[in-house]
């Protein structure tokens, strides 16, 4: 890519009481990123201690925005999105590490494919290098309201090396043009956390854009290969947002399928599971996630 073809990229990441993780993230940019036209925005989501000075010791040009309170993944990142000046915004988790050519490969997709509305790189597990986490997303199952990542936990033997469209971007690293954000809107704050990237992808596709997976760009993610630890917090937001996503994005037939399955299978199964495990706070949060939808006016994506 010639030097004149390096449009400004805004890297936006979120931190909340994870100063050292974010420091490692910034160090990885210093070590591996050669992209010459870059701004870095770290949004602090109400950490107990202001991390600004620590971050600036590592990267003097970093912009640190202090929210004061935890606005969630969506609200926090939207603060950074609003402040960003780049033609392209790379919204990325702070528990990731860059590799050489990451940004160049993502920008290339937009420069060569005018229909691109969002693109994610290939994800490898940081603690299991050579093992794929993400090489695209499968569609959401209309019965369960869940989906899975293409290639997840497979050894990377070059089987996903073709640039391709995919159903959804990876919320841990997604590049979006400013013009698309201006047209579609920022991250949907109704979700707070979980399912937000799926909903945003649906909004972008409805405007006629496509979601791309770029295998030339690789990022390492400090995500466990095993299922994440359950918590009442996750039980609430996963339940609430799964229902919210299906309400906002699925056809009448798909919603009928989902709610029939959810009522007859998901509710009894999860209720019994939490009772057997004596996870009564999880059980309460699961039901709170369901009951949240009663007497709520849902904004549908059109």
Where are these regions (language model features)?
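N-proximal low-complexity "stem/linker" segments adjacent to membrane-targeting elements
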Residues: 1-31
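A conserved acidic beta->alpha catalytic loop
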Residues: 28, 44-53, 69
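Short beta-strand/loop segment that forms part of the nucleotide-sugar
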Residues: 37-46, 63-67
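Glycine-rich, basic loop-to-helix element that forms the pyrophosphate-binding segment
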Residues: 66-84, 94-96
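Short aromatic/hydrophobic "clamp" motif used to bind/position activated sugar donors
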Residues: 89
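Conserved donor NDP-sugar-binding/catalytic core segment of glycosyltransferases
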Residues: 97-134, 140-142
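A short, conserved alpha-helix in the catalytic core of glycosyltransferases
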Residues: 167-186, 190-218
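Non-catalytic, C-terminal membrane-associated alpha-helical segments of glycosyltransferases
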Residues: 233-241, 251-302
